C-alpha cells in the first residue's frame, strides 16, 4: 500500500463531531459527487476507487441524516480495471445537499466553500480532510521530492481550498493542470503540518521518521563527498609538489636549496600522504604552522617553474 493510501486509510477511521461531519461530507460530495434524475427523483452518486473512503461516506451519511444509502461496486474496464465504489443517495438527496451548502441553482454544485460550513476551526480541518480524501495525493517521503496536492475540477473551489489551507499557515499554492486545478505544497515541514491539521498523526510520524533518516543520509553523503573532494585536492597538491621537488633535485640538487626549503622538500618526498598540518609537526627544527609549510612549498613550486622556463632561480 502506498504512503498516500495508508494516510487516507488512517483518516477514514477518525471520529468526528457532528458539525465536522457536515464539513467533511461537503468536501467529499462536492469533489466526487454527481447528480442525475430518475423517475423525477434527484439521485446523488459519490464515486471513488478507495473502499475505505466509500465506507466512510456511507457511514457519515447514515450517522448524520439516518437515510437509506446504497453502496454499489463496479469494475473498470480500462487500464488497471480497479473496482469503482458508488455511494448512492436517493432519499432526501436535495434536502441533504442543501444542508451541506453545496447545491446551487439548476441543480449544480456550488463552487465556493460556504463560510457558515467552516466557521469553526475544527470544521475547517474536517473540510480539508474531506478534500484530501476526495482528491488528494502525497508522495512517499522516501522519494526524491516532497509533494502533496489536492485536485479540483473548478478554479473557484481550488482557490477557496487554497485560501482555507493557508489559514493554517501551510504556504500552499495553486496550479492549473490539463483537466483541472491543484492546490499543492512541496515543503516537508508544511506537509507534516498538513497531516497534523487533518488528523493523520500516525502518517505524520512515519513521514518524519523517514525524512529524518533521509536528511541524515544526505548530510552524511555531503560530508563524505566534501571529505573526498578535500582528500583528492590534498593528494593532487602533494603529487604536484613531489614532482616539482624531484625536478629540482634532478636539475640543481636539493643541497643547493636553503636549509628551510631543503628540510621541507625531503619531508614532503618521504611523507607524501600527510597533510600540511602534519608535515609542520615533523620539522626537527621546531613545529611550523600550516601557513608556514604552505609558503615554503609554494616557494619550491616557484623554483621548479623558473627552472622549467630557463629563468634565473631565486633560492632565498
Swiss-Prot record:
One of its GO terms (molecular function) is DNA binding. The keyword Hydrolase does not apply. Residues 275-309 bind DNA. Keywords: Cell cycle, Cell division, DNA-binding. It holds the Pfam family HTH_WhiA. One of its GO terms (biological process) is regulation of sporulation. The keyword Cell division applies. NCBIfam families: DNA_bind_WhiA. Involved in cell division and chromosome segregation. Belongs to the WhiA family. This is Probable cell division protein WhiA.
Amino acid at each position: 500500500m502506498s504512503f498516500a493510501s495508508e494516510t487516507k486509510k488512517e483518516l477514514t477511521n477518525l471520529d468526528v463531531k457532528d458539525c465536522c461531519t457536515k464539513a467533511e461530507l461537503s468536501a467529499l460530495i462536492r469533489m466526487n459527487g454527481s447528480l442525475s434524475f430518475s423517475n423525477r427523483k434527484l439521485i446523488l452518486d459519490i464515486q471513488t476507487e478507495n473502499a475505505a473512503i466509500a465506507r466512510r461516506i456511507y457511514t457519515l451519511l447514515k450517522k448524520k441524516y439516518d437515510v437509506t444509502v446504497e453502496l454499489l461496486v463496479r469494475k473498470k474496464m480500462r487500464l488497471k480495471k480497479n473496482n469503482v465504489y458508488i455511494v448512492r443517495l436517493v432519499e432526501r438527496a436535495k434536502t441533504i445537499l442543501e444542508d451541506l451548502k453545496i447545491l446551487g441553482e439548476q441543480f449544480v454544485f456550488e463552487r465556493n466553500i460556504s463560510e457558515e460550513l467552516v466557521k469553526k476551526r475544527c470544521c475547517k480541518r474536517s473540510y480539508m480532510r474531506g478534500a484530501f480524501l476526495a482528491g488528494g495525493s502525497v508522495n512517499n517521503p522516501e522519494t526524491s521530492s516532497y509533494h502533496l496536492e489536492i485536485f479540483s475540477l473548478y478554479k473557484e473551489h481550488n482557490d477557496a481550498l487554497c485560501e482555507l489551507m493557508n489559514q493554517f499557515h501551510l504556504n500552499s499554492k495553486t496550479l492549473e493542470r490539463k483537466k483541472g486545478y491543484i492546490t499543492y505544497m512541496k515543503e516537508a515541514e508544511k506537509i507534516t503540518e498538513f497531516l497534523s491539521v487533518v488528523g493523520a498523526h500516525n502518517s505524520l510520524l512515519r513521514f518524519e521518521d523517514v525524512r529524518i533518516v533521509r536528511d541524515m543520509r544526505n548530510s552524511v553523503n555531503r560530508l563524505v563527498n566534501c571529505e573526498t573532494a578535500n582528500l583528492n585536492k590534498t593528494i593532487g597538491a602533494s603529487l604536484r609538489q613531489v614532482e616539482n621537488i624531484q625536478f629540482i633535485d634532478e636539475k640543481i640538487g636539493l643541497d643547493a636549496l636553503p636549509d628551510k626549503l631543503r628540510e621541507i622538500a625531503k619531508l614532503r618526498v618521504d611523507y607524501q600522504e600527510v597533510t600540511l598540518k602534519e608535515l609542520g609537526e615533523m620539522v626537527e627544527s621546531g613545529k611550523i604552522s600550516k601557513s608556514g609549510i604552505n609558503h615554503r612549498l609554494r616557494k619550491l613550486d616557484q623554483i621548479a617553474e623558473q627552472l622549467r622556463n630557463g629563468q634565473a632561480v631565486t633560492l632565498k
